[in-house]
C-alpha cells in the first residue's frame, strides 16, 4: 500500500484494551498494544498515503460468542446501549474506516461497544 501511496488498514481490537477485567490480562494487554501499534503505524505510514485505524468492539453476538449464553447479555447490560452488538454493526464501522468517506481519519481507535468504555 505504501508503495502505491494509497490504502487503509483497519485493525480490530476490543473494549477490554481500555479497562482492567479479571481474567483478561493477556488478551486485554495484547489488544492495548494493538491500539498503540495502530497509532504508531498511522504516524509512520500516513505520510506515505496509508491510513491506519482500529475498531474496538464490545460484546457482539456471533457464532463464537453463542456459548457465552446469558453471560454475553449480562456483559452487554453494563453499557448504555444495554445489548450486544450484531456482527453487522461492527462490520459497518470497519467498512466506514476503510472507505474514502474516512479519508481524513488517521490513528483513530473507534469504540464500537455500545458506550461501555464511555460510561
Task: Enumerate the predicted regions with their spans.
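Alpha-helical segment proximal to the catalytic Tyr-Lys
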Residues: 43-47, 103
Amino acid at each position: 500500500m505504501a508503495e502505491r501511496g494509497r490504502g487503509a488498514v483497519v485493525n480490530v481490537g476490543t473494549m477490554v484494551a481500555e479497562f482492567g477485567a479479571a481474567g483478561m490480562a493477556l488478551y486485554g494487554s495484547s489488544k492495548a498494544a494493538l491500539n498503540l501499534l495502530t497509532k504508531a503505524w498511522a504516524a509512520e505510514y500516513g505520510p506515505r498515503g496509508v491510513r491506519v485505524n482500529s475498531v474496538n468492539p464490545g460484546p457482539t453476538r456471533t457464532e463464537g460468542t453463542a456459548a457465552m449464553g446469558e453471560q454475553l447479555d449480562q456483559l452487554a447490560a453494563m453499557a448504555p446501549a444495554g445489548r450486544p452488538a450484531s456482527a453487522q454493526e461492527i462490520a459497518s464501522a470497519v467498512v466506514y474506516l476503510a472507505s474514502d468517506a474516512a479519508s481524513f481519519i488517521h490513528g483513530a481507535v473507534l469504540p464500537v461497544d455500545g458506550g461501555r468504555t464511555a460510561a
